[in-house]
Structure formats: C-alpha cells, structure tokens
Design a protein with these regions (language model features):
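Basic/hydrophobic alpha-helical interface regions
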Residues: 250, 257-260
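Gly/Ser/Thr-rich loops at beta-strand to alpha-helix junctions
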Residues: 231-237, 267, 330-333
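Non-catalytic C-terminal accessory region of glycerolipid acyltransferases
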Residues: 63-79, 89-90, 298-450
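N-terminal mitochondrial targeting presequences
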Residues: 23, 37-50, 58
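Active-site cradle of extracellular carbohydrate-active enzymes
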Residues: 259-315
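Membrane-anchoring hydrophobic helices of lipid-metabolizing enzymes
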Residues: 61-226, 232-246, 256, 281
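N-terminal chloroplast transit peptides
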Residues: 1-32
Length: 450
C-alpha cells in the first residue's frame, strides 16, 4: 500500500488543533497539537487493525498503557479530521506508521534504553518526533512548498546557525530562506537521527572493524578518498551509520555526518522520505531498473546520471570525499519461504564505475566493504516496488555495522570481476559474523554457513 499525496495531506489535519479556525504555521500547528494532547481526551477507536504488513514477523510485545494512550490519541485525531467518506482509504497507512513507531518506542522504554543525554524514552518524545516528521513531510514533501533537489549532488541542510568550519552560502539565498521559513535554522541531519535513534537498541548493537574505520578516517584527513561498498537493508541506513558511529566517539560521529550517500529517485520524491534526505549529503543516481521502467524518460534520466557522475568525479578530484554506495542497487530482501535474509548481489558494472571514477580522480581512492544489519529496524517490502510511498514498518532492535578490510584497487579490466567478488565476499563474511554476534542466526542463509 502506498502513501499518496492525498494521504500525506491528512497529516496537515493531524498536526493542527481540533478546535482552531486559524491557519497556523507548521511550528504553531505542532505546539497546538502537543498542547491538545496534554489537555484533552479523545474518543479513540479501541479496535486494532489487522496488520497488512507482509514484510516481517509481527510484533509480539505489548505496548505500555502510556504509549498506547498517546498512540490512540494521535490516531483518533487523524481519523476525526479526515474528510467524510475517505476514512478507510486515508487512515490505514498513517495509522500503521504511527502504531509501528509508538510500539517501537514503547519497547525501547520497557527495555530500559535511554536517550544520549541519559533521559528516559517517553510517550511525549514519541509524539514530538512523529508530529515533527509528519509536519516536515507535509511542508517539504508535497504541494507548492515541496523541496526540490535541484542538484544531482545535494549537500545536507544543517541550518543557518549550524556551527561548522565553513559558512553555508545557500542560507544567504532569499528564495531558500522564504521556502524554509521558520525551519531555516533546522538541522535536518540531527532531526533524522533524533527520529530513528530511540528505535535502535544501541546498547546491544555492534560496530566491528573499528581499526579499519580509523584507517579510513585518516585517509580522508590526508585528502584521499574512501568508498564504502555496502549492503543495504533499510530506509534508515544513513541514520544507522550515524548513530552507530556516534557510539564510538565524537570524531567518528562527525565523520558520519560528512559521508555522501548514493541514492535513488525514491529518497528525493517520496513525501515522507524527503525531509530525511534533506539532511544528508547525496548523489542522486537513477538505478538501471528505474531508468528502464519508462522508455520516454530514459534519455533524461541517463543525462541526469551522467551529470551525477561528473559531479562525483569533481568531488573525488578535490579529495577527502567519503562515499557510501550499495552496489546491489537496492535493499536486501528476505526469502519469504525460509525467512533468511541474503545480501543482494553486488552489480559488477556499478563497482567498475566507482573504481574508474577513483582512478580518473588522480587521488588515492580506497574501497572498504561495509556489512550492515538493520533489516528489523525498518523492514522493507518483500518485493521491489517501482513507485514511491511504501508502507512503513519500525521495530526496536539491535543493529550492526562491520567495516571490512580494504580491498586494493588494483588489477586490469580482465580481472575486474575478482575485485567485485572479493568485496562481496568480505561483506558477506562481515554480515554473517554480525548476525551471529547479534544473536540473529535465524537470518543467515544456509549457503553462508558452508
């Protein structure tokens, strides 16, 4: 089931005060609804909808009464404001997303998980995070004020007041300031991390290969380039990288914020994904599947990809560029029969292209396979969907990253397949070890154990 523009429009009503006839700004709407949550009682439907999700095992934990009340208030507010006759069509996707998120934070609170400042995870935090996410999606993901990723290489929107080593001249542009409005100072990178971090069981998560990460950071510091060849498991993988690197230390956390992610069309067009993408350094590249899906737009998409390649080459020539790319071109999908989750195969041509760009840059470019375990955090659909707006699932779960040994960028064209095979094998090995360490052996494909 997909999120359409009309479905996202209901978020406006969800983030507005029930009794107000005044047109509020996004932030005013949030303040109004938060106040309403505290001061009013809503008649929420007590019937739980049967989950339509076929992407992961059903949540078996029980939501706490406090989180349940906050969730029901949120869903009731949404339902009460939907146009007559549209409830059944519009309510389910957003209600499912809300339910999933509140359940995950309830599980986090029950486990004793804490926020980075040591505070407890609360229903109020779930309300604030969800309302903020939906309001950003409404404001920047659709309609006249939709944020347009005008450049194939997007730089993270960290806010006009962000204290970095350089000044972001974009915030001097009057048109951008007008579009962002009160959010001109919003750090969308931090907002994305704040949304997903409570759903990550960081205490029981794993970051292995930290010596390799340290080496990669030193190479970046020396003006060289690093490419992480990763498997891809969830929409929240950029936040997974950031939040796990933060657990290592400030230096690693700062490094995560500077990584550039190679992204497909969905992250810049799906209304709920747009605000999270605004906070990331991106290279927007259409996958081969997406290019071939529509013959009429194929030439334009191919030109955009060429522009992205040229932009990436420019960054590599400058040096000090860290890139995260999933050579498979998409997320890992579970085997619906066995329940195992194999890594999607690395695409030879994709790996070749990044090696070529590294060589053409005339700067030393280093390649590190990166294994990721994040499937349970935001389980993807079991089958690839061409459109945007997939159903969102969220779980409280441990996650893991393994930075594997560097694969030397050597060898001619006749042996290029050996490089890809080596990188994929390293990723599979790291992935298998992570699953064992996280006590998720049930996901290990039989062929990985041989």
């Amino acid at each position: 089931m997909k999120f359409s523009s009309s479905i996202l429009a209901s978020a406006l009503l969800f983030s507005a005060s029930c009794s107000s006839a005044v047109a509020f700004s996004t932030h005013q709407r949030l303040v109004s609804l938060r106040t309403t949550f505290v001061s009013s009682t809503f008649l929420a439907s007590t019937a739980e909808k049967e989950s339509e999700c076929s992407t992961a095992e059903s949540t078996t934990t029980t939501i706490s009464p406090e989180f349940e009340a906050a969730r029901d208030q949120a869903i009731a507010t949404l339902k009460a404001q939907l146009p007559p006759g549209t409830e059944s069509k519009l309510e389910a996707p957003l209600a499912h997303f809300i339910s999933e998120y509140f359940q995950s934070l309830s599980d986090a609170a029950a486990s004793g998980a804490k926020n980075p400042d040591g505070s407890s995870i609360t229903p109020q935090q779930a309300v604030k995070n969800m309302l903020t996410s939906l309001s950003y999606a409404l404001k920047f993901g659709m309609g006249e004020g939709k944020f347009i990723f005008e450049n194939v290489r997007h730089r993270a929107m960290r806010g006009a007041d962000f204290n970095d080593t350089t000044t972001d001249a974009r915030y001097e542009d009057e048109a951008l300031k007008e579009k962002l409005g009160p959010d001109v100072t919003t750090d969308f990178y931090a907002a994305g991390c704040d949304f997903f971090r409570p759903s990550m069981d960081l205490e029981h998560s794993i970051v292995s290969g930290q010596d390799n990460l340290k080496k990669a950071m030193e190479q970046i510091e020396a003006g060289e380039n690093v490419v992480f060849l990763a498997n891809h498991q969830s929409e929240a993988d950029p936040q997974v990288v950031s939040c796990l690197f933060e657990t290592i230390g400030k230096e690693a956390g700062d490094f995560a914020a500077h990584v550039t992610y190679v992204a497909g069309h969905k992250v810049t067009t799906d209304a709920l994904a747009v605000p999270f993408s605004m906070g990331r350094n991106l290279l927007c590249i259409h996958s081969k599947k997406h290019i071939d899906a529509d013959p009429e737009t194929k030439p334009a998409k191919s030109r955009q990809n060429m522009s992205a390649m040229n932009s990436m080459l420019g960054g590599l020539k400058e040096g000090g560029m860290a890139i995260w790319v999933a050579p498979s071109g998409g997320r890992d999908r579970r085997d619906v029969e066995s329940g195992k989750i194999p890594i999607a195969p690395f695409d030879q041509k994709t790996v070749d292209m990044f090696r070529l760009m590294g060589n053409k840059s005339k700067k030393p470019t280093h390649f590190y396979p990166m294994a990721m375990v994040s499937y349970d955090l935001c389980p993807p659909p079991d089958f690839v969907e061409a459109g945007v707006g997939e159903k969102r699932n969220v779980r409280f779960t441990p996650i893991g990253i393994a930075i594997c040994d560097e694969v030397p960028n050597i060898g001619g064209a006749e042996k290029r397949h050996l490089f890809t095979e080596k990188a994929e094998a390293e990723c599979i090995q790291g992935y298998t070890e992570l699953l064992k360490g996280l006590k998720m052996e049930k996901y290990i494909p039989e062929e990985y154990s041989s």
